[in-house]
Curated annotation (Swiss-Prot):
Domain EF-hand: 412-447
Entry keyword annotation includes Translocase: yes
Protein family: Belongs to the MscS (TC 1.A.23) family.
Database matches in SUPFAM superfamilies: EF-hand, Sm-like ribonucleoproteins
The protein's name: Mechanosensitive ion channel protein BA
Entry comment, domain topic: EF-hand domain is involved in the detection of calcium concentration.
Ranges in a coiled coil: none
Gene: mscB
Length: 943
């Protein structure tokens, strides 16, 4: 049943025609098979699978068109087999390749026999049928005999040159093992040595065979003919040229061997040793956890880099494969089994070869072979590192220690265990984390690859140098050849020298560049392939090294830069890859007022950071901070010295470590805290802006406000809204007897800081209150709810104020017009002093606007301290009148501006408290603190 709340019910939908309701092919649909015998999914499951046959060939394929024909590709050349003109090896080429795969003796017999048989025919004919036949005065058999000797001696000399290195290594290796390296030179000089030996044999056998053969001796014709002398000179010239060629090749090989020994020998040995140690660890890991076990199945598949062994045989979870995959899965399983069986057979043959030769020969299952192959790729290197680390580390630990390696390798291999641990513990902190071992093994593989690339590029540079020297040797050989052939040797030398002198001006720059490049590359050699260098303050990665130039990649933007070696020979080059643990210095500018204690606190914070467990693998525990400058006496320049535990060869690692340290440095500076330069001046400016104004408050008021204040309390303009709304006052309208007005304004309010006394505001004829005197303060009690009644029994002119007791401050009746604080009257301990601003503003008011002074508990004190004086108020009564008539001095309640001032007002007054009824009590006792008897007496008198 559809959901009635579904918003898609009433949406009109357009009907779309289709062949079926589900959109899939009907089972009755017939799809023709491919005529080419291709794979058709529909052919296998034509009736069972719902979508079977959807990938089969279209009907047009049955007609022979619509598709590209298949072409057979040769695996060796990568070219179609039907196009021999594109460089495909012909049958003769395939035969030659088959011959090259034969043994040395068989191959040489194949080389020698055909031509030797052809040369033997004239010899046989001259010895049997044409005995009198001669060539240049030499009988036919002996002439072709010398040619046969020349041809056969070429291959014999080649065999001798091939055997010489082994003989030299066997003989000289017994005397000194260090001389074995020269066997490599002899092996590389096989062709030059062959040419020299061949020329020697040809020259030595020419005259004896041509001139001094037995037939000439019988005939007495032993004189050397002119053409024989010329041939002898030519052979001698060829011998000299062969010697020059041999010398040039020997020089190149000596440069190559000495250079490789100087630059790469130590690195090659270290790389081989590291691979051997990793092989030991991997072999121990395999002994604990066999290959392809459930713990390391994926890692072993990655290490072996085999598609057949990688991944599970089943599909993804929740996905069932169709039956069409069963044959492929069967083939895959067969291939897996065949591959493993083949590996076992190869391993068995390798074990036999190891027993015979003592070396690992074609043993693909050997640990060293697997490690060497795994280090070629980053992914397999990481898998190898994970397998070793996880198999060695005990459960519950987060790092690999030396005792773990010793325990796994067993007794008697403590030296190998320590060497393995030293190789992997690059930071030297005593433990190896998973990230650290991955980084170490990946670095070993990367070093191995860069070393191979460096050797290859240097070999290319040496090859270029070889070609250059070979060109020079060829020029010299031509001169030597000409000198031996012609009679005027001096004339030829003079002509050649003149030619070289004229060409020296043309090739002077090139010769200088070549010589400088050779010195830079083979003598100095400041970098290798893959090194991170800095040239003219720009970081680069070396990509290629040639004889005359080098190619770099910029680290910042990946630009490729080519620089001539003669230019690099004149600049400073910083090589980060060849450096050990590096130090970094950062300069920060701080405030000039920074103290030594703050600098030491900053150093402690940074040392805490570098010594934490997360960072001790990257940085050394020591940090240097020094004051390197003071600028223009406005700042301090601090230099922070940070010691890394590795170099900066890997840019990503260096950038991550530097970013982490910079964030920690900023956090430490904020935590101390250390201010930036100029922070003190900014604080002083902010303090000046926040300083209170010393001028009176009335001076800052607008002129209109000042004029209203100076006019006195008779002309108030602005009501004070700061009074609390909980005070009460009552107004009685004379026109309406019994009517009472309640207004929520108050005449008592606390002043901000001026608590030395309180002032009651005057009641004017206009029944308004002036703002400066609307505020009064009730100390400590906060009593703002006292009702005050205003009546009309006394006129405003003869109005008296009632003194009310407020805790420790006793308020006596006073003249409202004076409003001044008496000198010598101090506040009590529980009152806060008035602020200077308030006091100054009060003193700046006119005399008739000053607030009344605070009153003392005893009236006698006031009479002694303050003599009677004439009030400055315009009212007719004096200060003494208020104390002489306490019963008639009724304190009015202030009112707000909310009531109607146009109505006639009647004020009620509360009678003053009788002092005699409060004997034994201080006159400033609050009625709320009285006893019941005192309260009743007070209420009766008040009413």
């Amino acid at each position: 049943m559809p959901n009635p709340n579904d918003v898609t019910i009433d949406i009109p939908l357009t009907s779309v025609s289709s062949r079926g309701q589900t959109g899939a092919r009907n089972n009755s649909t017939n799809i023709p098979n491919s005529p080419s015998g291709g794979y058709s999914a529909g052919a296998e499951h034509n009736g069972g699978a719902e979508k079977g046959g959807l990938t089969s060939s279209p009907p047009s394929s049955s007609l022979g068109f619509g598709h590209r024909r298949r072409r057979t590709i040769n695996d060796k050349t990568g070219l179609p087999a039907e196009e021999p003109e594109d460089g495909t090896v012909t049958r003769m080429g395939r035969f030659y390749q088959a011959v090259l795969n034969f043994s040395t003796v068989t191959r040489y017999l194949i080389y020698i026999a055909p031509l030797a048989a052809l040369l033997a025919i004239p010899i046989i004919v001259g010895a049997t049928a044409a005995e009198d036949a001669k060539i240049g005065g030499v009988s036919l058999p002996w002439f072709f005999c010398w040619v046969e000797v020349v041809w056969v001696s070429l291959w014999v000399c080649k065999l001798v040159a091939k055997v010489i290195p082994f003989v030299f290594q066997f003989v000289c290796g017994i005397v000194s093992a260090g001389t074995r390296k020269y066997a490599l030179i002899l092996r590389n000089l096989e062709i030059p040595i062959t040419m020299v030996l061949w020329m020697i044999v040809s020259l030595v056998t020419f005259l004896p065979i041509m001139v001094y053969n037995p037939r000439n001796k019988r005939e007495g014709d032993t004189e050397t003919k002119s053409w024989e002398k010329s041939v002898k000179n030519v052979l001698f010239a060829f011998l000299v040229c062969a010697l020059i060629f041999l010398g040039e090749k020997t020089l190149v090989q000596l440069i190559s061997i000495s250079y490789h020994r100087k630059q790469f020998d130590a690195r090659i040995k270290e790389s081989k040793r590291n691979i051997n140690l990793i092989g030991i660890l991997y072999d121990a890991s395999r002994s604990m956890f066999p290959m392809y076990c459930k713990e390391f199945r994926e890692d072993d598949a990655i290490i072996s880099d085999s598609i057949l062994l990688g991944g599970p045989e089943t599909g993804r979870p929740g996905h069932s494969r169709s039956n069409s995959a069963a044959p492929l899965r069967f083939i895959r399983g067969v291939q897996q089994n065949v591959g493993r069986i083949g590996g076992k057979i190869t391993g068995a043959l390798g074990d036999v070869a190891h027993e015979i030769t003592g070396k690992q020969v074609f043993n693909s299952s050997a640990a060293r072979s697997i490690v060497s192959e795994a280090l070629e790729r980053r992914r397999s290197s990481e898998a190898l590192a994970r397998r070793i680390w996880m198999s060695f580390v005990i459960e519950g630990r987060e790092a690999l220690y030396l005792d773990d390696i010793m325990e796994v390798l067993g007794a008697g291999k403590e030296a190998e265990a320590e060497e393995c641990f030293t190789m992997l513990d690059r930071d030297g902190n005593g433990d190896i984390s998973l990230d650290e071992i991955i980084l170490a093994i990946s670095e070993i593989g990367r070093t191995r690859k860069t070393l191979n690339h460096s050797v290859h590029d240097v070999d290319q540079a040496i090859h270029v140098l070889d070609n250059l020297l070979a060109t020079i040797a060829f020029i010299i050989a031509v001169l030597v050849f000409v000198s031996f052939v012609t009679s005027g040797f001096g004339t030829v030398i003079a002509a050649g020298a003149t030619s070289l002198l004229s060409l020296s001006f043309v090739f002077a720059t090139t010769a200088q560049e070549v010589l400088g490049s050779c010195i830079f590359l083979f003598v100095k050699h400041p970098f290798d392939i893959g090194d991170r260098v800095e040239i003219d303050s720009k970081p680069y990665i070396v990509q290629r090294i040639s004889l005359l130039y080098s190619v770099f990649r910029n680290v910042n933007d990946n630009r490729v830069t080519q620089i001539p070696n003669v230019v690099l020979n004149t600049v400073w080059i910083d090589n980060y890859s060849r450096s050990s643990a590096m130090q970094e210095k950062l300069t920060i500018e701080v405030n000039i007022d920074t103290t030594t204690e703050e600098i030491q606190a900053l150093k402690d914070e940074i040392e805490t950071f570098v010594r934490s467990p997360d960072n001790k693998r990257d940085f050394h525990p020591d940090v240097d901070i020094e004051v390197s400058g003071v600028g223009a006496l406005d700042k301090l320049e601090l230099t922070v010295g940070l010691f890394h535990k590795s170099n900066w060869a890997i840019e990503s690692v260096r950038a991550a470590r530097r970013s982490k340290f910079m964030v920690a440095l900023v956090a430490a500076v904020k935590k101390v805290p250390i201010r930036t330069p100029g922070a003190a001046a900014e604080d002083a400016a902010a303090a000046d802006g926040d300083r209170p104004d010393d001028k009176p408050d009335d001076a800052e008021q607008p002129p209109a406000r000042q004029s209203s204040i100076s006019e006195g309390i008779r002309h108030p303009t602005v009501p004070d809204d700061s009074f609390p709304s909980d005070s009460k006052s009552t107004g009685v309208d004379l026109g309406r007897p019994g009517s009472v007005q309640r207004r929520g304004a108050s005449a008592t309010a606390a002043t901000g800081n001026n608590s030395a006394g309180s002032a009651y505001s005057e009641t004017t004829l206009n029944n308004t209150v002036s703002e400066p005197y609307q505020r009064s303060f009730t100390p400590n009690t906060g009593d703002r709810d006292t009702d005050h009644y205003h009546g009309s029994m006394s006129s405003p002119v003869t109005e008296r104020h009632l003194g009310v007791s407020h805790d420790s401050i006793a308020r006596k009746a006073s003249t409202a017009s004076t409003g001044r604080r008496r000198a010598g009257i101090m506040t009590t301990a529980n009152q806060s002093l008035a602020s200077p601003t308030t006091m100054q503003s009060e003193s700046a008011l006119p005399p008739h606007l000053q607030p009344p002074p605070p009153l003392q508990p005893s009236s006698s004190q006031y009479s002694q301290q303050y003599p009677q004086q004439q009030s400055q108020s315009p009212y007719s009564y004096t200060y003494s009148e208020r104390y002489d008539q306490p019963e008639s001095s009724l304190q009015p309640l202030e009112h707000t501006t909310s009531y109607n001032q146009s109505l006639p007002q009647v004020y009620e007054y509360a009678p003053a408290a009788d002092r005699n009824s409060l004997e034994g009590h201080s006159p400033h006792v609050d009625p709320r603190h009285m006893t019941e008897e005192q309260r009743r007496n007070y209420e009766s008198r008040r009413l």
